Every structure is written in C-alpha cells, then in structure tokens.
Amino acid sequence: MLQFLVGPEMFMDNNIDSLINKVKQFSAEGWSLGVCHGVSHWERVERNGLLLATDEVNSIVLRLFAYLHDKWRVDNWEDLEHGKRAAENLPALRGTLLSWLTDEEFNLLCTACELHTVCHSTGNPTIDACFDADRLDLIRVGITPDPERMATERGAFYAANLGQFYADTGTSEYDFYL
C-alpha cells in the first residue's frame, strides 16, 4: 500500500537542497532585471553565506535569503525599498513554498530581507551573516567591500583580506565583474 505524505510532513525528507532549489526556481521565474541581481548573484550570496556561517547561524535561513532578498526588485540601482517589499511578499509563500520553515526561521528570513539594505547589523548571527553574504558580492559592480561596514567578524576578515576570500571560494576577482 502506498502512503502519501501531506502537509508539513511531506517536507521532512531532509532534502534541503531540493527545497532550496524550488525557492531558487520560484525566484528565477519571470526575472527580468538581468544578472546584476539575478541567479548568478544569488548563487554567490548563498556560497558566501555558507562560508561565513558559524555554528550560531541558521544556514537554511541564510540560503533562502540568498534567493529571496532581491526577488521583488523593480530596478538594479535605485530601489532601496526592495528589502521591505520582499518582507511584505514573503507571508504569501508561508502556506506553500515556505510552509516547512519554523516560525522562528520564517521571522528571521523576513527580518533579514527587510533590513538588508537599510541596516548595518542587528546582533543576530543569522541575519548579520545574510547581510555580509550579500555585501561580499558588491565586487561584481566594482565596489570593494568595506571591513568597517561588515556585520560579522568573518565578513570583516574577508573584506579586509580579499585574496583569502578568493582562495577560500575558489574564485578570482575577475570572476565577479558583470
């Protein structure tokens, strides 16, 4: 007899990569702003975040942030409200795409998205790692990350030591430019 899982249980297959990939696909659907804030940026933010993650960081929230923080952008340059729009749109996904998150994880994700363009740091290790994961990818638009503006110790280290950042990510400075 076949048994089908319904509700939150269907997401408890420990296949986080599959769930993250569904979010990535959702974010890419209809994306029209090109690569500056598109999939390649999101993938680097995810990679950067995992590099920055300490034991205190919720890596699931960090990975989801990578693919959702820019989803509701309306342009690539003058859109300081996109984080707020992301936080306002995420509740619509709570019962579907993000139904497997705990309330704490969902709230962390909303806060990280909302504040990532307007806040330097929060003191929360997960949210601050999200901020720095995004900031370390400023290189793609010719902006060198400022160690003084990073929210985490690791983020500040990598911003001050870009050679080590490139070595640890297996990249070079030329891999980032658009």
Question: Where are each of the predicted segments found?
Answer:
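An active-site-proximal "capping" alpha-helix that borders the catalytic cofactor pocket
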Residues: V45-L50, E81-T96
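Divalent metal-dependent phosphate-bond-processing catalytic cores, especially two-metal-ion Mg2+/Mn2+ enzymes
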Residues: F4-G7, F11-S18, A28-V57, L68, ...
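His-Asp-centered metal-binding catalytic motifs of divalent-metal-dependent phosphohydrolases/nucleases
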Residues: S59-E78, H82-A86, C110-T117, D134
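Short, well-structured alpha-helical segments
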Residues: V39, E43-E46, R63, D103-E114
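Alpha-helix N-cap/helix-initiation sites
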Residues: V35-G38, D55-V61, D79-G83, T102-D103
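Short amphipathic alpha-helical interaction patches enriched in hydrophobic/aromatic residues
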Residues: S27-W31, D70-N76, R94-L98, T117
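Short helix/loop segments within enzyme catalytic domains
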Residues: L19, L97-L101
